[in-house]
Amino acid sequence: MSTGLTAKTGVEHFGTVGVAMVTPFTESGDLDVAAGREIAAHLVDNGVDALILAGTTGESPTVTTAEKLTLLKAVREEVGDRAKLIAGAGTNNTRSSVELAEAFAEVGADGLLVVTPYYSKPSQEGLVRHFTEIAQATDLPICLYDIPGRSGIPIESDTIRRLSELPTILAMKDAKGDVVAAAPLIEETGLAWYSGDDPLNLVWLALGGSGFISVIGHAAPNALRELYTSFEEGDLARAREINATLSPLVAAQGRLGGVSMAKAALRLQGINVGDPRLPIVAPNEQELEDLRADMKKAGVL
């Protein structure tokens, strides 16, 4: 389905149906590399063409740099070049982000996801300088990550325009949801624009977005691939039907939070990825039963 919008070269680097993959842990709370391989293979076998590691859903604040690098190397060995591996290199410390970006480049990441610096609330000029230093640290393509609900500040439109002029900044993960502001930016900047909030997946496609970086995709990778394909083939009715079918998963994510929902959903589907690390906690028994019911409604259990 042609949108008539500017071609987005970032798609070739960041894929179309991405999942912000959980980081699996053993019962003792250590990194579970074998489970990481299993999750990655499962997702890629079922239509996912980009895995985002060490992001929000990957519990990046509580995962060490060594663990992040170990997981990325293991996933690369497991899926090869069947999916793009995008590494979360954003922190609220520019120097640390640069070091992390360089480390991910050395172990074979295909691209970087760089979130807005959180907690410190820098100015827009500070954001430009922060992202620019990271972009200059490696040759890897970069996807900006705008999520003011967690970072405390938005990446404003003029800042996005400035950053889009940098040669390696090719994409945006939008978890801000300001579709009025974003619609012209998709055209003006040529950035590949990704839904970073599952309730808006179909909306972003309609506005010229390039795909998804999803949480509910853990439970429904095939359905997300079909949603994307149906839209691209012009079957809007089918895309809307799939989107509606997935709404119970969206509701569950809203109740439980992305990490807890995704890990519990995988466990219910037979893939044990362990509990989250504190301060995030697993669902209680009632919450788990409610999730089970939602997954059955969505046809994924």
Swiss-Prot record:
Which subcellular locations apply to this protein?
A: Cytoplasm
GO MF terms, alphabetically ordered: 4-hydroxy-tetrahydrodipicolinate synthase activity
Q: What is its main location?
A: cytoplasm
What does UniProt list as catalytic?
145 (proton donor/acceptor), 173 (schiff-base intermediate with substrate)
Q: In which pathway does it act?
A: Amino-acid biosynthesis; L-lysine biosynthesis via DAP pathway; (S)-tetrahydrodipicolinate from L-aspartate: step 3/4
The reply to whether rRNA-binding figures as a keyword in the UniProt entry is no
The first-level EC class reads lyase
SMART domains noted in UniProt? DHDPS
* GO terms (BP aspect): diaminopimelate biosynthetic process; lysine biosynthetic process via diaminopimelate
Q: What does this protein do?
A: Catalyzes the condensation of (S)-aspartate-beta-semialdehyde [(S)-ASA] and pyruvate to 4-hydroxy-tetrahydrodipicolinate (HTPA).
Name of the protein in its database record: 4-hydroxy-tetrahydrodipicolinate synthase
- UniProt source species: Corynebacterium efficiens (strain DSM 44549 / YS-314 / AJ 12310 / JCM 11189 / NBRC 100395)
Its lineage reads:
Bacteria, Bacillati, Actinomycetota, Actinomycetes, Mycobacteriales
